[in-house]
């Protein structure tokens, strides 16, 4: 007979909590961030910066993801990052934006002045 009853959910929560990063700044959709991503090419590794607007921040715990969009040579580029991945070195917030949605998918259809986001002064 077992002395302690531990269910699988408690074990999973404990394992996931040990793998979470603690140095992640607070940001939401509409904010402009830089994600420092580690790229492994053969035996070499390098850090690549991806700067853009957060379209969506989704999930919780170790499965939390963020979609970042930027314009590169007139072409929109979106990249999805797992926030707590060991390949993400760090995340920097450049400026905070004011939007009314959690998922700003309408930004995909906009360019130029209509793609501007009002800046929020957060300290």
Curated annotation (Swiss-Prot):
Tell me which domain of life the UniProt entry assigns to the organism this sequence originates from.
Bacteria
Gene Ontology molecular function: any one:
structural constituent of ribosome
Sorted UniProt keywords: Ribonucleoprotein, Ribosomal protein
Q: Which GO terms fall under biological process for this protein? A: translation
Signal sequence segment: none
Q: Which InterPro entries does the protein's record reference?
A: Ribosomal_bL19, Ribosomal_bL19_CS, Ribosomal_bL19_sf, Translation_prot_SH3-like_sf
**One GO term describing the cellular component:** cytosolic large ribosomal subunit
Q: Which PANTHER family match?
A: LARGE RIBOSOMAL SUBUNIT PROTEIN BL19M, RIBOSOMAL PROTEIN L19
What function does this protein fulfil? This protein is located at the 30S-50S ribosomal subunit interface and may play a role in the structure and function of the aminoacyl-tRNA binding site.
Q: Which family does it belong to?
A: Belongs to the bacterial ribosomal protein bL19 family.
**What is this protein called in UniProt?**
Large ribosomal subunit protein bL19
Q: Which organism is it from?
A: Ureaplasma urealyticum serovar 10 (strain ATCC 33699 / Western)
